[in-house]
Amino acid sequence: QVIVINAPEKEGVATPTAEEILAIRDKVAASEVTAYEDNVVKEPLIAEGTVLKGSPVKKTVEDKQLGTTEWTLANGAKVVVKPTTFKADEVRLGVVGKGGLSLLSDEEYYMGEMMPAVNSMSGVGKFSATELKKQLSGKTASVQPSVENYTSAMGGVCSPKDIETMLQLLYLNFTQPRFNKDDVDNLTKMLLAQLANAKSNPDFLMQEKVADVTYGHNPRRQMISTEIVDKFDFEQLPGIYAKLYPGANGFVFTFVGNIDPETLKPLVEKYIGSIPAARKPINYVDDKAYPVKGEVTEEFTAPMQQPKVSVNYHFSGEMPYTLKNKMALTFLTQALNSRYLVSIREEKGGTYGVRVQGSTKYIPRETYSMTISFDTNEEMADELREIVMKEIEEIAANGPKSEDIEKHREFMLKSWKNSLEQNGAWMNYIQIKYGS
């Protein structure tokens, strides 16, 4: 018999002795353990007697190019349907509305950020997460809320035969979110334990510092900390959730997969149509949490078992949100990735790899950002930093190498062709059209 114990090696953490472990083993072996009996009784997800008033479709729009049908319901919900035959047993659901964490105060912000984890642990309606899993046994259907700085969302997936179950879960997530104090207390305990260990992780400390410096110590863009978790207030959670998901109007509900629109329509009218409308459609608020302007340099040290230097560059600014600019930034990041692979990894052997990532946004402003990061040793750090900037200046002056662009162009074309037969890709394309 082999017993394995894993525990962090740090001051204040007591590891049980061999004698204590064996005593626990002997106690369990001597106890009388009865077989587990699952006495779950299947119940309707939505309680019997619940009146679902529904809302009819009042407007229909066909998009021949995307192959979609758009319904606007009387309660203000917008529903987009894209039938496909890529996967016979898959229907995807995407729900997005503008708003997100921007609707919350600074004090509410991080509780809102943790809301998806709370939902996952607490269940929905009258069912705990464990009870819900049992109720859904034999079915393939799930719905999970998510939230970003400027959007509130939900995602779901089901088999075609279980689409009504998925819609019931969707209705419950909007109208009957569940908050259980024991579940939330367990979540906060888990977070505090993870954060206690993270404080000795130099990679976490680096991420924490980058977020703090990039956004000028803005309280809405910090890494989560023990101080933040200690301020979580269970009583505020229902009100915060209501701000994130106030009603059906302002949200776009997208279905992609093996669906028959005529079969789906009455179910949409029944369940999505029964989600109440908010007094005014959801929309985001510009919370002014922008990256700092100008050049800012920050250096710090942290204890580590294996010494290294981590370098992170963050470039950002305003840029018109156009397809041309998005493509240009994509090609720039790939050109830099190719150049750094040669000049830093292969020629200098200074790092396992340089990570270059770029993104564009149009909410709350039209902006771009690009990060360049790598790990190296102290002796080579300054030299590699010079190479990073030299490659950027070279592209700015003379443009990228044609072979780098052509290689990525071929990759993008191949990826795009493959994406045309993926439900997830079509979900993304449709949500981009509707401003998500």
Task: Name each model-derived stretch.
Residues Q1-P8, V80-K82, K87-Q176, N186-A196, ...:
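M16 family metallopeptidases and their MPP-like homologs
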Residues A18-I24, Y109-G112, M327-F331, M389:
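Short intrinsically disordered coil segments
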Residues L244-P246:
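Conserved alpha/beta enzyme-core scaffolds, especially Rossmann-like or related mixed alpha/beta domains
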Residues F234:
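Phosphate-interacting basic helix/loop segments used at nucleotide- and nucleic-acid interfaces
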